């Protein structure tokens, strides 16, 4: 569907032996090592969500300044202007959360739930921004020749990989009320 530049495939390791001196991190500790890296991975995703949203908004403003309907640039209509204001506000709110989380990470103090909140908020925001931007492109936004169409499709996976939005909510809820 999206991310056409990414090559995804399955790997199968049947009847394979790894010498004990070649095991990284210790036998049976791979899952724990993976879990330790998830907050950083989710933070990186959140940074990407904010950056992608910034880009989509920029493209959309540029396009709607040029595209005319009823003799006026689409950007001049109140609906478009309010959409720009809403999206910019949401992007900046998420940027603040990402920056706070980056600072915590740099101090070695980024919790699993903080990273989950950051990833949840920014990936959901990216989906909303992609949808509104595509709408402002009109019919052209639906055509794959336009980068907003590709960005819309690519935004969808942000709410899936690194832990789905539902998993992020569970991580956050557990930090509040336990299992």
Model-assigned labels for residue ranges:
Residues 1-10:
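FAD-binding subdomain of flavoenzyme oxidoreductases
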Residues 10-16, 20, 27-29, 35-179:
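Alpha-helical interface subdomain recognition
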